């Protein structure tokens, strides 16, 4: 039986683990060969020292090797946040996913139940009538027929059950908060990823590059794990093998700046109603932040030349009813009915 103890000692001494060592350590944990105490000790040793790019990449490689995969087109993308920003905001990435799919980009959306908000992606999508526990074949069909499929993380990463109890008992952020957005079961190569703190922007962009992503924007929106219309968004963009950083304000792309209070969400039913309102073309601060994130996603997907062009395409996706049609098709296909 493999032993986690040498890796705990290495991490606790402040020594960084190589990608190979990190993968080996996570393989031990994810296969049920470590005790809850060992898992907790290892995770906190990494957290206190600060997780490195090779360690995150090794952990993701371990998760990806065990996941139940979903078949998606080569040009599919994911739009996802780490959660953990404590903002209680609307489900921006979920709504953005429908708008982007309505603009013609296949979306393989990976998500979970609430972490920092009162309603996570899975909670809100379930409230809209989507079967979040659909099997991999049904999700693949949803992506090809509706343009979007939702992959509920626990259904695809069952090995996480071995680390779940330790995470709950620790009650604080660990490396696993960073791994979900990097472990998409459809192995997409294009991502818009939101992070809960700005220090993770460049490291996660480097991890995505290390793991084979072609284009990605890692974003932090002034307290939100997405691009924001309530302040300045910081971006680390992976494009053509290079990583560059820049900032974006809503005004420079023609959007109204709002107050953080205007982006506050509620329970799943309330968030579902608000999401539907955006897709039904009701003007709101929520619509504006979705347009900003959709514009960025369309740039990442290679569908838009720049952010303003992407936002214009996002407006068209909503105004034409295409985004709402995607939602209706996903509800039908996920429940195994004709689209």
From Swiss-Prot:
GO biological process, one term: L-tryptophan biosynthetic process
Residues that, per the record, bind anthranilate 1: 81, 112
Gene Ontology MF annotations: anthranilate phosphoribosyltransferase activity; magnesium ion binding
Cofactor note: Binds 2 magnesium ions per monomer.
GO cellular component term, pick one: cytosol
Cofactor names: Mg(2+)
Matching InterPro entries: Anthranilate_Pribosyl_Tfrase (IPR005940), Glycosyl_Trfase_fam3 (IPR000312), Glycosyl_Trfase_fam3_N_dom (IPR017459), Glycosyl_Trfase_fam3_N_dom_sf (IPR036320), Nuc_phospho_transferase (IPR035902)
Pathway the protein contributes to: Amino-acid biosynthesis; L-tryptophan biosynthesis; L-tryptophan from chorismate: step 2/5
Protein residues bound to 5-phospho-alpha-D-ribose 1-diphosphate: 81, 84-85, 89, 91-94, 109-117, 121
Family stated for the protein in its record: Belongs to the anthranilate phosphoribosyltransferase family.
Quaternary structure, from the entry: Homodimer.
UniProt-recorded name of the protein: Anthranilate phosphoribosyltransferase
Name of the gene encoding the protein in the UniProt record: trpD
């Amino acid at each position: 039986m493999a032993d986690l103890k040498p890796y705990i000692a290495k991490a606790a001494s402040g020594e960084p683990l190589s990608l190979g060592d990190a993968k080996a350590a996570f393989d031990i944990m994810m296969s049920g060969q470590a005790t809850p105490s060992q898992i907790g000790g290892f995770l906190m040793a990494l957290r206190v020292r600060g997780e490195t790019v090779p360690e995150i990449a090794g952990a993701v490689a371990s998760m990806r090797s065990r996941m139940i995969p979903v078949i998606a087109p080569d040009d599919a993308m994911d739009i996802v946040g780490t959660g953990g920003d404590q903002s209680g905001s609307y489900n921006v990435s979920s709504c953005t996913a429908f708008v982007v799919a309505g603009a013609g980009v296949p979306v393989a959306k990976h998500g979970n139940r609430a972490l920092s908000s009162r309603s996570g992606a899975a909670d809100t999508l379930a409230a809209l009538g989507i079967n979040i526990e659909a099997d991999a074949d049904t999700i693949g069909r949803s992506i090809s027929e509706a343009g979007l499929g939702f992959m509920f993380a626990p259904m695809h990463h069952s090995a996480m059950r071995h680390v779940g109890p330790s995470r709950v008992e620790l009650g604080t952020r660990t490396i696993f908060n960073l791994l979900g957005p990097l472990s998409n079961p459809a192995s997409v190569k294009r991502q818009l990823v939101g992070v809960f703190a700005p220090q993770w922007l460049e490291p996660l962009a480097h991890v995505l590059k290390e793991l084979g992503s072609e284009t990605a924007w890692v974003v932090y929106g002034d307290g939100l794990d997405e691009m924001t219309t309530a302040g300045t968004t910081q971006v680390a963009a992976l494009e053509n093998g290079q990583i560059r950083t820049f900032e974006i304000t809503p005004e420079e792309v023609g959007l109204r700046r709002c107050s953080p209070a205007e982006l506050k969400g509620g329970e799943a039913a309330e968030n579902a109603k608000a999401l539907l309102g955006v897709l039904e073309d009701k003007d709101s601060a929520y619509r504006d932040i979705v347009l900003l994130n959709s514009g960025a996603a369309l740039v990442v997907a290679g569908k838009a030349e720049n952010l303003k062009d992407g936002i214009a395409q996002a407006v068209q996706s909503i105004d034409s009813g295409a985004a709402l049609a995607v939602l209706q098709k996903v509800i039908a296909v996920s429940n195994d009915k004709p689209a």
